Design a protein with these regions (language model features):
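C-terminal and inter-domain tail/linker signature
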Residues: 1-148
Length: 148
């Protein structure tokens, strides 16, 4: 089995987010293992393979989120706007990396996303993504916590 330098996997995560933002599915495909799997446990969904991933992203209702373009699509009774997606931090070592992101929707809601990447032979073998809205802090903890 080939050995992959840690920095190469980190660079691949950077390239992943750049390719997603650019909608460059050909470049993204080069980063994915042939057995790529993307899981979203909160909704109980699994995407198998690069082609399914490509087709799903091509059919995102308002286009994929980014920080440059905000498209609005919809019909008379349903409108979908594209959120802004900001990668805040990427950490990891070896074959496991995690990215933390902040997603801001046009309605003012803010969500947080965590994507866990696992590598095999320098390619992204699997990805697990968690999404959660911002929550109000519980009052009972106020005297022990610091708000940020």
């Amino acid at each position: 089995m080939p050995t992959v330098a840690t920095s190469s996997n980190r660079e691949t995560v950077d390239k992943y987010w750049l390719a997603v933002n650019a909608r460059d599915w050909d470049s993204l495909a080069k980063l994915l293992d042939p057995d790529y799997v993307w899981e979203m446990p909160q909704s109980g969904e699994r995407v198998r393979g690069e082609q399914s991933n490509r087709e799903m992203n091509d059919n995102y209702p308002a286009g994929l989120p980014d920080i440059e373009t905000h498209r609005i699509t919809g019909s008379e009774d349903r409108w979908v706007t594209t959120p802004s997606w900001t990668v805040l931090k990427i950490t990891g070592t070896g074959d496991d990396y995690v990215s933390e992101s902040r997603v801001s929707y046009p309605d003012g809601s803010v969500w947080h996303a965590v994507d866990m990447f696992h590598f095999r032979d320098g390619k992204i073998r699997s990805q697990v993504a968690y999404f959660a809205p911002t929550l109000e802090a519980a009052e009972w903890r106020a005297r022990w916590v610091e708000r940020f």
